[in-house]
A protein has these predicted regions:
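A structural supersecondary motif
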Residues: 7-39
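Compact, well-ordered interaction domains used in eukaryotic information-processing assemblies
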Residues: 29-142, 146
Length: 183
């Protein structure tokens, strides 16, 4: 006989997808993006790495924390970011080089799921096969974006987590008064 589980039974033959974006943005230091006080002289860019919902929807109802493991040369290179409703999970730094960032996703306790690990490459400079592809990565303010669409697939979630996933949560973070959107 299976042990008693506080999360309920698994919802058989069910898959629930939750889309999100993992990405980096980088901006070279300039008059419009000045070097922060205390940043080393050899640093050339400010950059951010983040995990957020599509169209800035809130994902904290299913994702409770994200761990970003940065390059070992960065002080406090393992950063644990707790979820705040309506805000992306984000780390902002300065630097001069590109590197792989390990991104570990921790789900809400009701999920009963183990953490998931992803990898994302910090891009400070545009890349592509053609000049058009490179220019497509740069915004008007000179920001280089390297964003990836991801989907988290929950196979046969526990009943408690299934109810959370299908409750219609996921409001846009820019409009807290808007009605909840079904995901």
């Amino acid at each position: 006989m299976a042990p008693n589980n506080q999360l309920g039974k698994r919802v058989k033959l069910t898959q629930v997808r939750r889309p999100f974006i993992v990405g980096t943005t980088a901006v070279p230091f300039s008059e419009t993006n000045p070097r922060p006080v205390g940043a080393p002289d050899n640093h050339t860019h400010s950059w951010s790495v983040f995990v957020k919902g599509l169209e800035d929807t809130d994902i904290t109802y299913w994702l409770r924390r994200v761990q970003f493991k940065l390059h070992e040369s960065i002080p406090n290179h393992v950063r644990m970011i707790e979820g705040e409703a309506g805000k992306p999970f984000m780390v902002t730094e300065t630097g001069w080089g590109e590197f792989d960032i390990t991104v570990k996703l921790y789900y809400v306790n009701e999920s009963g799921e183990k953490p998931q690990t992803l990898y994302h490459y910090l891009r400070l400079h545009p890349f592509g096969r053609t000049e058009e592809e490179k220019q497509a990565m740069i915004t008007k303010n000179g920001e280089v974006r390297a964003w990836s669409y991801e989907e988290q697939l929950f196979n046969e979630p526990y009943e408690a987590f299934f109810n959370i996933l299908t409750s219609g949560q996921g409001k846009k973070s820019t409009d807290a008064a808007a009605p909840a959107r079904r995901q």
